[in-house]
Amino acid sequence: MRHYYSVAAIRDAEASLLASLPDGVLMKRAAYGLASVIIRELAVRTGGVTGRRVCAVVGSGDNGGDALWAATFLRRRGAAADAVLLNPDRVHRKALVAFRKAGGRIVENVSAATDLVIDGVVGISGSGPLRPAAAAVFATVSASGVPVVAVDLPSGIDVVTGVINGPAVHAALTVTFGGLKPVHALADCGDVTLVDIGLDLPDSDILGLQAADVAAYWPVPGVHDDKYTQGVTGVLAGSSTYPGAAVLCTGAAVAATSGMVRYAGSAYTQVLAHWPEVIASATPTAAGRVQSWVVGPGLGIDATATAALWFALETDLPVLVDADGLTMLAAHPDLVINRNAPTVLTPHASEFARLAGTPPGDDRVGACRKLADSFGATVLLKGNVTVIADPGGPVYLNPAGQSWAATAGSGDVLSGMIGALLAAGLPAAEAAAAAAFVHARAAALSAADPGPGDVPTSASRMVSHIRTALAAL
């Protein structure tokens, strides 16, 4: 499990540790870790360290000090080391003295012969885009294709929201210290490496599942399980206009777990043609017993659709509401607010705005938390980084790392997967987070099949790769 910490939590832990250490020890510890990561990166990219050239772009404060000390350690290992000082009057003095003593050079610009650039402009206390001088330096670096290693986070990216509102560093690798921050999931920070500097941090309430966590959560049939005890997923989706939504949603539920899927709606003929193992009927009341309901994908907003939404939400079962279900729910939020059973809402940005009255904005984590608390429901906000908020509980971040899931019908697939996990008994937030993780993996695998390169994919192909994604956990 990944834990993401606020800047305040990191600063509090640093203050406690700094009080117990001699002056400068913590900075050197961080810089040594940074230099060690850079040594490995240089070895991979260039075959070694000796004779290679690094350049630290140095801002004021401790972030610049980390970069200078790291460049000093690299110089001592045989690399040529340069430094561009963006604010010479406010540079970390002790680090600069050590850098010069080791033979480092102060330069005006990054040399064309540079093998790697260290971004030490601003750290986790900074905000806003790069200032003109730094922006000019990194524009040249970007044009030259020299890889950048960022210290703590790529400068110019908002540390809280991950939003970029102007010039920013594009890093191949980010090295951070003590604990991950939400920005490392919310923004493109390249590969992220965490260096342990001895901070004593509690568990956080912003989390990220890893493959081992998902494997532990995902239901596996026990020796004495049958199709009923594994969970029966009910699906209320599709219409004469969008029968494919029903096919995709039920297919994803079939692929996600080994229990049973029941479908109720007008697309039952198409569903059975694709998935003969599904038990299909024309109406919810005829569907039979289930352990969860998925309602909304392709359902429409007519009287029949409204009745289906009412039917599901008036049960005492876990319910996932998506797509057209969210549109109807926006007009009748009391249907969810008064529920005692688990409810999962899975909006994209426009659907979120209808539910909340305003778009999620830059602070997607804060907005998702607020909506979850106001509705008393687990909210999954779709995007390249999926945000899942539990009312009064943790937030899960799932960075996809690619956008292959951004295709028509992809949300229908995700809904079916979450519904299957709810039927199997997983808590709502864990079901949503685990399904989002596997959903992103299935999208990537479907784009890579048959190879050798990635190609456009589709929601139908994603369904067929759910099991492959699960097997790879």
Swiss-Prot record:
InterPro entries: Carbohydrate_kinase_pred_CS (IPR017953), CARKD (IPR000631), Nnr (IPR030677), Ribokinase-like (IPR029056), YjeF_N_dom (IPR004443), YjeF_N_dom_sf (IPR036652). GO terms for biological process: metabolite repair; nicotinamide nucleotide metabolic process. It comes from the Bacteria. Residues 1-203 are annotated as: NAD(P)H-hydrate epimerase. It catalyses: (6S)-NADHX + ADP = AMP + phosphate + NADH + H(+); (6S)-NADPHX + ADP = AMP + phosphate + NADPH + H(+); (6R)-NADHX = (6S)-NADHX; (6R)-NADPHX = (6S)-NADPHX. Residues 10-205 form the YjeF N-terminal domain. The keyword Transmembrane helix does not apply. One of its GO terms (molecular function) is ADP-dependent NAD(P)H-hydrate dehydratase activity. Keywords: ATP-binding, Isomerase, Lyase, Metal-binding, Multifunctional enzyme, NAD, NADP, Nucleotide-binding, Potassium. Its cofactor is K(+). Residues 210-473 are annotated as: ADP-dependent (S)-NAD(P)H-hydrate dehydratase. The keyword ATP-binding applies. It holds the Pfam family YjeF_N. Its EC number is 4.2.1.136, 5.1.99.6. K(+) binds at residues 63, 119, 155. (6S)-NADPHX 1 binds at residue 152. Bifunctional enzyme that catalyzes the epimerization of the S- and R-forms of NAD(P)HX and the dehydration of the S-form of NAD(P)HX at the expense of ADP, which is converted to AMP. This allows the repair of both epimers of NAD(P)HX, a damaged form of NAD(P)H that is a result of enzymatic or heat-dependent hydration. In the N-terminal section; belongs to the NnrE/AIBP family. In the C-terminal section; belongs to the NnrD/CARKD family. HAMAP family: NADHX_dehydratase, NADHX_epimerase. This is Bifunctional NAD(P)H-hydrate repair enzyme Nnr. It comes from Mycobacterium leprae (strain TN). The lineage of its organism: Bacteria, Bacillati, Actinomycetota, Actinomycetes, Mycobacteriales.
